[in-house]
C-alpha cells in the first residue's frame, strides 16, 4: 500500500496509484446541493486534496475517477474553467505579501482569458477574468480557494496588517457575488472562519459545511474506513507492538480519533497521523511534528487565559463557528484549529462542551506550551520531564521539589500576566505533563486539593499556598483529610506543603512529611 503522505494532488495520487479514501459520493452530492460553500477543518486534514479532487472533477478528467463512487454517478463529465487560488504557499507577515500573491494568480489567469487595461484594482481584474472565462469557454466558472485565512492568521497581533488583509480579501471575494451569473461552483477552505467584519460579508448565500452533519466526514477518516481500508497495516502494527488487533485499534483511537464537528456526530481520525503511523508502523506525534502555529500563543497571551479551563469550556455554535478579530477569546481559534473539539452537546441550552480530541493533541499541545510558561526549554523538555518522573517513581520528594523550585526560578516569563495566573498556568502544564506518565489528580470530593500524584510504589499529596505558609499548607492536608482515601493503601505516602511567592514569582519554601 502506497501512502500519499504530503501529497495534495488528486491527479498525482491516482496516476501513481497511491491510496485514496473515496469521498467522491459526497463530492457528487456537494456539487448538486448548492453553489457557494465554505469549509473549515484543522491543518493536515485533507482540505487541499479535497480542492484538488474538485478541480479534477470540474476539469472533466473522468479517467482519474475510474472505480470510484462518482464514476457510476456522473453521466456528463463536462469540463469547466477552474480558477484555483492557493494561499497556502506564501508567508504573509510583511505588508504587500498578500497583494503580490493575488496579483500573480490573477495575472496567470489573464494570460489564459485576457485582460482589459481599464481594470485597475484586483477586484476589478478578478471580476473581468471570471466574465471572460465564461464567454471564452461557454461554461460557467468554478472557483476554488485553498487556505483563504492563512494571511489573516499570520497577521494576528498586527491589527493594521490584518485590517488591510481583510479589506483586500473582502473586495476580491466580493467578485463572486457580482459575477454570480457566470459561476457554476465555489468552495473556500481554511482552518478558521473570521466573523464580524468578515471577508465573506457580501456572500450572504455562502453555505458553511464546517458543522454540517451530512458532510462531517468529507475530510478525515471514519472508524469504518479505518477498519476496512487499513485492515492489513493494523495487523502489522499489532504484531510489531505485540498487541491484539482490538488493542491496536483502541490505541489508534486513543491517539488519533476524537474529532467531532457536529453535535452527537461520529468520531473522525486525523488522516495525516494515521498515514504516518501505518507508513512507519510506529505510534507517534506526527501532527505536531509539522509545526504548531505561534498565533495560538499570541492569542493566549492577549487573553491572559487560564489554561486549566481548556477542558472545561462550554460554548455555542455561533461562537465556535466564527472568529471575531476584535476579540481576544482564544476558544474559537483553538476549536477550529483542531486543538479542542466537541465532547458533548446540551440540546436544551444549545451548548457544546469542549475538550482535547485525543492523546496526540493533548500531549503535543502541552509540550508546545510548556517552554512559554516555564523554565523548560524545548530541546530539554523530554529529558527534564523524565527527571521529574524518575524522582517520583523512586520516592525522592526532596529532589522533585528542588527541580520544581529550579524550574520556576529559571523561567524567562515569555507569557506576561499577573503572578497568580502565571503560577496556575505553569503548574497546570507541569502537572499535565506528569499525568502522561503517572496518575495525577487535582481535586478531591472533600474540596479543592492542589495535586495528588500516584506511582506504583508512592503517593504524593501536595498542597500549594500563594503568599501563604508552607506550614499551613502541610497542616491543611491533614485538616481537609486529603490522605484519608489512601488510609488502607500500602504504598508510602508523602505530604508536601509548598508556598509560592507572588512577588518573587518563585517557590520560596516547602515542607515534606
Regions found by a protein language model. Give the residues of each.
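Active-site metal-binding core of divalent-cation-utilizing nuclease and nuclease-like domains
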Residues: 133-137, 430-456
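Structural motif
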Residues: 142, 458-460, 494
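Conserved catalytic cores of phosphodiester-cleaving nucleases, focusing on short active-site segments
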Residues: 427, 451-466, 480
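Short, mixed charged/polar active-site loops
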Residues: 448, 459, 506
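Domain-level recognition of nuclease-like catalytic cores that cleave nucleotide substrates
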Residues: 485, 489-513
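Phosphate-binding site recognition
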Residues: 1-419, 434
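Mg2+/Mn2+-dependent nuclease catalytic core
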Residues: 162-168, 466-483
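Metal-dependent nuclease catalytic cores in nucleic-acid-processing enzymes
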Residues: 172-179, 332-340, 428-432, 476-496
Amino acid at each position: 500500500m502506497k501512502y500519499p503522505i504530503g501529497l495534495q494532488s488528486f491527479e498525482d495520487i491516482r496516476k501513481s496509484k497511491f491510496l485514496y479514501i473515496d469521498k467522491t459520493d459526497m463530492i457528487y452530492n456537494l456539487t448538486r446541493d448548492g453553489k457557494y460553500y465554505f469549509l473549515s477543518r484543522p491543518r493536515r486534514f485533507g482540505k487541499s486534496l479535497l480542492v484538488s479532487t474538485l478541480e479534477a472533477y470540474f476539469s472533466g478528467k473522468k479517467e482519474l475517477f475510474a472505480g470510484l463512487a462518482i464514476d457510476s454517478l456522473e453521466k456528463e463529465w463536462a469540463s469547466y474553467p477552474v480558477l484555483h487560488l492557493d494561499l497556502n504557499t506564501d508567508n504573509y507577515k510583511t505588508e504587500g505579501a498578500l497583494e503580490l500573491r493575488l496579483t500573480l494568480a490573477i495575472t496567470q489567469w489573464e494570460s489564459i482569458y485576457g485582460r482589459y487595461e481599464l481594470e485597475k484594482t484586483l477586484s476589478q481584474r478578478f471580476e473581468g477574468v471570471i466574465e471572460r472565462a465564461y464567454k471564452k469557454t461557454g461554461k460557467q466558472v468554478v472557483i476554488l480557494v485553498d487556505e483563504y485565512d492563512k494571511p489573516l492568521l499570520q497577521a494576528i497581533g498586527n491589527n493594521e496588517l490584518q485590517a488591510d488583509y481583510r479589506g483586500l480579501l473582502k473586495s476580491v471575494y466580493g467578485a463572486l457575488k457580482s459575477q454570480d451569473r457566470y459561476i457554476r461552483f465555489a468552495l473556500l477552505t481554511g482552518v478558521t472562519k473570521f466573523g464580524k467584519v468578515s471577508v465573506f460579508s457580501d456572500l450572504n448565500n455562502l453555505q458553511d459545511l464546517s458543522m454540517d452533519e451530512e458532510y462531517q466526514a468529507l475530510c478525515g477518516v471514519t472508524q469504518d474506513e479505518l477498519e476496512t481500508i487499513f485492515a492489513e497495516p493494523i495487523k502489522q502494527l499489532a504484531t510489531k507492538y505485540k498487541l491484539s488487533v482490538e488493542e491496536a485499534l483502541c490505541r489508534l483511537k486513543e491517539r488519533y480519533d476524537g474529532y467531532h464537528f457536529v453535535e452527537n456526530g461520529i468520531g473522525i481520525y486525523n488522516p495525516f497521523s494515521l498515514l504516518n503511523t501505518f507508513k512507519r508502523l510506529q505510534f507517534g506525534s506526527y501532527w505536531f511534528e509539522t509545526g504548531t502555529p505561534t498565533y495560538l500563543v499570541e492569542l493566549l497571551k492577549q487573553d491572559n487565559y487560564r489554561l486549566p479551563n481548556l477542558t472545561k469550556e462550554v460554548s455555542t455554535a455561533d461562537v465556535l463557528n466564527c472568529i471575531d478579530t476584535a476579540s481576544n477569546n482564544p476558544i474559537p481559534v483553538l476549536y477550529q484549529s483542531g486543538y479542542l473539539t466537541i465532547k458533548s452537546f446540551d440540546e436544551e441550552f444549545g451548548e457544546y462542551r469542549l475538550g482535547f480530541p485525543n492523546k496526540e493533541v493533548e500531549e503535543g499541545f502541552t509540550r508546545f506550551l510548556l517552554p512559554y510558561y516555564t523554565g523548560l526549554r524545548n530541546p530539554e523538555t523530554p529529558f527534564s520531564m523524565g527527571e521529574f518522573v524518575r524522582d517520583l517513581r523512586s520516592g525522592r520528594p526532596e529532589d522533585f521539589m528542588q527541580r520544581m523550585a529550579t524550574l520556576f526560578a529559571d523561567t524567562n516569563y515569555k507569557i506576561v500576566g499577573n503572578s497568580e495566573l502565571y503560577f496556575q498556568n505553569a503548574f497546570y502544564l507541569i502537572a499535565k505533563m506528569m499525568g502522561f506518565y503517572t496518575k495525577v489528580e487535582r481535586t478531591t470530593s472533600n474540596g479543592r486539593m492542589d495535586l495528588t500524584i500516584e506511582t506504583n510504589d508512592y503517593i504524593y499529596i501536595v498542597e500549594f499556598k500563594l503568599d501563604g505558609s508552607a506550614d499551613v499548607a502541610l497542616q491543611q492536608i491533614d485538616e481537609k483529610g486529603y490522605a484519608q482515601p489512601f488510609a488502607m493503601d500500602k504504598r508510602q505516602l508523602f505530604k508536601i506543603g509548598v508556598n509560592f511567592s507572588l512577588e518573587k514569582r518563585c517557590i520560596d519554601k516547602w515542607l515534606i512529611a
